[in-house]
Swiss-Prot record:
Pfam families, alphabetized: Methyltransf_5 (PF01795)
MF GO annotations: rRNA (cytosine-N4-)-methyltransferase activity
Keyword check for Signal: no
Phylogenetic lineage: Bacteria, Bacillati, Bacillota, Bacilli, Bacillales
Source organism (scientific name): Bacillus thuringiensis subsp. konkukian (strain 97-27)
Protein name in the entry: Ribosomal RNA small subunit methyltransferase H
Keyword annotations: Cytoplasm, Methyltransferase, rRNA processing, S-adenosyl-L-methionine, Transferase
GO biological process assignments: rRNA base methylation
InterPro entries in UniProt: RsmH, SAM-dep_MeTrfase_MraW_recog, SAM-dependent_MTases_sf
Enzyme Commission number: 2.1.1.199
Length: 310
């Protein structure tokens, strides 16, 4: 079962300024925490469309929210297809869209999914079980240079070269098949003093591989642009990020769409295509409260940004 503790629940949904008869999209259904709170605020005229690429999450939510009937619609898809899937449902604009970019706890805690460095399991890390690329492929087939690049760019790992060298040397004799084997190689690549600080030594590399397997940053960037297009004037987009790379994409995208570019002086009016699309609701990100951090350790790196369509 999905017993995912939802992060920044009220702040994210309340930040959408819910209209009871509106149409909303939860791009990251997961355990259904945000969806549950959002549905409770809708009248019969309102509806929620929820995306997830995980079949278990979809089935769980269908059971959990069956009493809402046609007000609750699930879409088994990556949110990169947001606009296409909504158009298939005959929806061309919505009142609000939310993204929670954390890996849901059940995925982390299901050993066989291979997301966690705490369990020994096959190297998988696919959010979508029908996708072809796995963590096994990345670790065993990608070149030393490719591994260094993703460890450094996606994981911000200082010892990227040393870890990639350990992986390269090991796989000359034997394929790296499990998360446990990979964790040991990562530890060998990090000097002992550094292993004792900054959390689990495998955290950054596992994050990097997960992002690469699921093409997460490119997918999010495309989906966020789609969300901005799909939201009605006065509608909002709420985004929870969990690491600096995602937050940078969100911050940059919101900023670019909420500012007027440098135009020639003396223009009598600003052409429509240069008018800002968004108004920032949060100048600085909203962070979890101390109480929430005590109750849910996984919330510590969460940041919430909200913008409104002009």
């Amino acid at each position: 079962m999905f017993n995912h503790v939802t992060v920044l629940l009220k702040e994210t949904v309340d930040g959408l300024d819910i209209k009871p008869d509106g149409t909303y999209v939860d791009c990251t259904l997961g355990g259904g925490g945000h969806s549950s709170y959002l549905l409770s605020q809708l009248t019969e005229g309102g509806r929620l469309i929820a995306f997830d690429q995980d079949e278990i999450a979809i089935q769980n939510a269908k059971e959990k929210f069956s009493s809402y009937g046609e007000q609750f619609i699930t879409v088994k898809s990556n949110f990169r297809y947001l606009s296409e899937k909504l158009q298939e449902l005959g929806i061309t604009e919505v009142d609000g869209i939310l993204f929670d970019l954390g890996v849901s706890s059940p995925q982390l805690d299901t050993p066989e999914r291979g997301f966690s460095y705490h369990h020994d399991a096959p190297l998988d890390m696919r959010m979508d079980q029908d996708a072809s690329l796995t963590a096994y492929d990345v670790v065993n087939s990608w070149s030393y240079e490719q591994l260094v690049r993703i460890f450094f760019q996606y994981g911000e790992e200082k010892f990227s070269k040393q870890i990639a060298r350990k992986i390269e040397a090991y796989r000359e004799n034997k394929a790296i098949e499990t998360t446990g084997e990979l964790v040991e190689l990562i530890k060998e690549g990090i000097p002992a003093p550094a292993r004792r600080t900054g959390g689990h030594p495998a955290k950054r590399v596992f994050q990097a591989i997960r992002i690469a397997v699921n093409d997460e940053l490119k997918v999010f960037e495309e989906a966020l642009e789609s969300a901005i297009e799909m939201v009605k004037p006065g509608g909002r987009v709420s985004v929870i990020t969990f690491h600096s790379l995602e937050d940078r994409i969100c911050k940059t995208t919101f900023k670019r769409n909420s500012t007027t570019p440098q135009l020639p002086p003396g223009l009598p009016i600003i052409p429509d295509e240069f008018k800002p699309k968004l108004k920032l609701i949060t100048r600085k990100p909203i962070l979890p409260s101390d109480i929430e951090l005590e109750e849910n350790n996984r919330a510590r790196s969460a940041k919430l940004r909200i913008a409104e369509k002009r």
